[in-house]
Swiss-Prot record:
Lineage start: Bacteria, Pseudomonadati, Pseudomonadota, Gammaproteobacteria, Enterobacterales
HAMAP family assigned to the protein according to its UniProt record, in alphabetical order: Ribosomal_bL35
Region (Disordered): 1-22
BP GO annotations: translation
Gene, per the UniProt record: rpmI
InterPro entries: Ribosomal_bL35, Ribosomal_bL35-like, Ribosomal_bL35_CS, Ribosomal_bL35_sf
GO cellular component: cytosolic large ribosomal subunit
Pfam families with a match to the protein in the record: Ribosomal_L35p
UniProt-listed PROSITE patterns: RIBOSOMAL_L35 (PS00936)
Protein name stated in the entry: Large ribosomal subunit protein bL35
Record key words, sorted: Ribonucleoprotein, Ribosomal protein
Stated family: Belongs to the bacterial ribosomal protein bL35 family.
Domain of life: Bacteria
Ranges of Basic residues composition bias in the record: 10-22
Molecular-function GO terms, alphabetical: structural constituent of ribosome
Length: 65
């Protein structure tokens, strides 16, 4: 049986947590920040958890995580 390939883009974007979930960085915080409210930017700063519906897709992309 051949090895399963890891999706490299997903490996760079998602990190596994201790309880088996995955965390990721929010979108919309790279450029064109002047028109975005300070509160919006502040809420985008912390890492977010992958939702339950998307978890299966991430697990399939990262078979060895």
């Amino acid at each position: 049986m051949p090895k399963i390939k890891t999706v490299r883009g997903a490996a760079k974007r998602f990190k596994k947590t201790g309880k088996g979930g995955f965390k990721h960085k929010h979108a919309n915080l790279r450029h064109i920040l002047t028109k975005k409210a300070t509160k919006r930017k502040r809420h985008l700063r912390p890492k977010a958890m992958v939702s339950k519906g998307d978890l299966g897709l991430i697990i399939a992309c990262l078979p060895y995580a």
